[in-house]
């Protein structure tokens, strides 16, 4: 049984489901049989970077990854807006306005907050049972409601053009779940009195996983050709490092695995991952000293 995470540095034009399929294929070729595999958050085909792929018991944590904040680097080209808000779409608006650098700095400051954002028409959101991007590609008008998202940080890394007329801006954004970077780029451009679209998008972090932990598709494919699994697999608990651990004794671990509520624990309320030694037992919620299991992990090394 294989349990853990493979963090793929997703290449351009590879879909998230194709990334999952590549992991399944390589595990099968390496002799690990049929493994349960899922990803922790869709990444656009035209984006690159961190794609957390869960294997085995780690798939129980995919929901946490979907809810986690993300960090992206992206480039906005001013003067042209496309229907997809990236390089793939057709041009729907143009502008001769190129914002002054000083205005870019001021405008970015206004976006570092909770904001209302309308997702792109070309998105995987469901509209009356159909994907929004399917409707958009069919030429239908797609109207999506705005949603509240949070931009925790937004910085200007580099730019082209002149101080009086910025042509492109490369930014880094730390954002809450549900944030669309293409929409953020659109809204920044419009706030600057022009239009724009994304020409580069790279995810640098998803939840606890950073780009430094990601492997290339070539390194993943080496697994199917005999490379050691430990060269690509992170342990299940790598997806839990952003929350505190709670150490259990063998009797407590047995109770948790049986679904019993533990009481009288001297810890603050909140989310923990319970462990026996170094082995994850469960994702748990503590309230008033009472422990309740949110997700149990069926790992063989847990003491009975």
UniProtKB/Swiss-Prot annotation:
This protein's encoding gene: truB
EC id: 5.4.99.25
InterPro entries for the chain: PsdUridine_synth_cat_dom_sf, PsdUridine_synth_N, tRNA_psdUridine_synth_TruB, TruB_C
Reactions performed catalytically: uridine(55) in tRNA = pseudouridine(55) in tRNA
Function: Responsible for synthesis of pseudouridine from uracil-55 in the psi GC loop of transfer RNAs.
Alphabetized SUPFAM superfamilies for the sequence: Pseudouridine synthase (SSF55120)
Molecular function GO labels: RNA binding; tRNA pseudouridine(55) synthase activity
Residue numbers annotated as active site: 44 (nucleophile)
Record's keyword terms, sorted: Isomerase, tRNA processing
Family listed: Belongs to the pseudouridine synthase TruB family. Type 1 subfamily.
Protein name: tRNA pseudouridine synthase B
GO biological process, one term: mRNA pseudouridine synthesis
Origin species: Novosphingobium aromaticivorans (strain ATCC 700278 / DSM 12444 / CCUG 56034 / CIP 105152 / NBRC 16084 / F199)
